[in-house]
Amino acid sequence: MGFKHKDIIGLQDLTREEIQLLLDTADNMKEINSRDIKKVPTLRGKTVVNVFYEASTRTRTSFEIAAKRLSADTINISASTSSVTKGETLSDTARNILAMKPDIIVMRHAASGAHHYLAQRVSCSVINAGDGAHEHPSQGLLDMLTMRQKFGTIEGLTVAIVGDITHSRVARSDIFGLTKMGAHVRLAGPPTMMPPGIERLGNVTVCRDMREAIEGVDVVMMLRIQLERQGKTLLPTLREYARYYGLNPQNLKLAKPGAMVMHPGPINRGVELSSYVADSDQSAILTQVENGVAVRMAMLYHVSGGELATE
């Protein structure tokens, strides 16, 4: 099957088959990334504009590397150094970028739904690099690629996602993607960080506490505490959070032997998980980062609609 979408706004919009196609393509891209010369001419002559209204290291750098390995020209625009600081609206920014004739816009924005708004107003492709608490599709895809790499399939896995679910766009993309691919998701977090009705998003169980959530699971996904997105009333102290919802060698034993530990980064060591767990053989955190480049290459390739050139 081909990829029918001009844009990738969220995994909620994609079918199981389309997610499978993106993961399979990412596997092919991993082969390119393992070469001595990590570059193919697939997107030669194409221009990718990265527009980031929020701070990012891994995602922005990963998209830039992905575009360059496909031979695209890349332009990076940061909100702190752009006309946004002078009061320019998203709509005006879009018009000005579009006047430069880009082929793909990769954007991160603090407002949920900003990418739908943008995609309706530009003729080029739009890829969501994270919008508010809505979705982060490339993170969801790289998480699934990392799981499939270890277990061979996502079908039948039980995955615990622990932490600040309310403010996490990663959690939503993981839920949409994992449940479509046949996994069961358990959620745990402080009641003030658990949105009502979240279980309606798919094959999801909301657990009373962390120990219940991680017992017997294949994967433990820890989420970052997003202090920049919440008021003081949601989280009494980081020490208290770590006591009840932090992953350490003791409670990790509740999961299946050899269970995989994941985190979208950046990590608050000693809060979401201990340094011992983060640096252990069970941790797949650096593998997630590595797989991020391949996944983003696959996303850029499919929205461009081109044929894969591998020589």
Curated annotation (Swiss-Prot):
Sorted alphabetically, which Pfam families does this protein's record hold? OTCace, OTCace_N
Query: Is Cytoplasm a UniProt keyword of this protein?
Result: no
- Which GO BP annotation is one of this protein's? amino acid metabolic process
What the entry lists under SUPFAM superfamilies is as follows:
Aspartate/ornithine carbamoyltransferase (SSF53671)
Molecular-function GO terms, alphabetical: amino acid binding; aspartate carbamoyltransferase activity
Keyword Transferase applies: yes
Q: Which domain of life is it from?
A: Bacteria
Q: Which UniProt keywords apply?
A: Pyrimidine biosynthesis, Transferase
Q: Which NCBIfam families match?
A: asp_carb_tr, PRK00856.1
Binding partners and assembly: Heterododecamer (2C3:3R2) of six catalytic PyrB chains organized as two trimers (C3), and six regulatory PyrI chains organized as three dimers (R2).
State the name under which the record lists this protein.
Answer: Aspartate carbamoyltransferase catalytic subunit
The organism named in the record is: Geobacter sulfurreducens (strain ATCC 51573 / DSM 12127 / PCA)
